[in-house]
Amino acid sequence: WIRLVLDRHKFPYTYIRDEDIRMGGLKDRFEVILFGHNYLDLQSQIHGIDKKFGPMPYTKTEKTPHLGVPDASDDITGGIGWTGMVELEKFLNAGGVLITLGNGSALALEGGLVRDVYRKSGAFFTPGSELKTKFLRTDHPLAYGLPEVTSVFRTWMPVYDIARSGRGGVIMQWGTKLRAEDREPEEPEATLTKEAREAKDKAKKEEVKMLVSGALKGEDELEGRPAIFDLPAGQGRVIAFNFNPVHRYLNRSDHRFLWNALLNWNALPPARGQAK
């Protein structure tokens, strides 16, 4: 789906294989690496198809003329492996930009390429929902041309949070309110004056609900959690989306986030917490 979007908009790119990442020298060849959404757990994102099934060629032959496109490999087992993870770390340390989409963000957020981010546990579920979001850094290039409060399409995938010291790296959050644990405790109803009760009722009616369309379970658990990260990694950075802006070429209104990331890769402000 990423290739379809880039091809249709005539956006130039180089398709790279697991072997290309393991080979190293990434910063000598690329400024930005885009890692797409997938439905794999972290182990499978790193190690790919089990090597016990290899070698497993993906090449064009007389018997398989339809294979080997857009690229070929003599063995597609093994994934990028730990060697590839080390090479991605070198790429970031040298100033490269890694952009991860949807569940593909687990590679960076859970794979150790950034710090202070952790998977959030809780009873939340977004099976395919349009949700309200809010930019916390409206001056960031990822927010160019967009209102402070907007909405994006989110399917089911992990939810992440970040240590308080790293929250400057959150560009956009889910919903428009503070996290539940950051809100002031409400006064007991019985202690409120009539005016205070009326003001509370009015505020509740005017409250912006997160769900725009679809289904949502555990809104309070998701409220205020990061939707887009911009995190330091060595001299480089990781732009991690907690949704997939190119979901099957259906959510075209979300392509804007990807374009902002790709077109402004060399105009990003210093990542919060990054050594100068």
Feature-to-residue mapping (PLM):
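Solvent-exposed loop/turn segments at secondary-structure junctions
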Residues: 20-22, 34-42, 98, 104-107, ...
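Stable alpha-helical elements in mature extracytoplasmic
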Residues: 2, 84, 104, 138, ...
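Short alpha-beta junction capping motif
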Residues: 30-107, 235, 241, 261
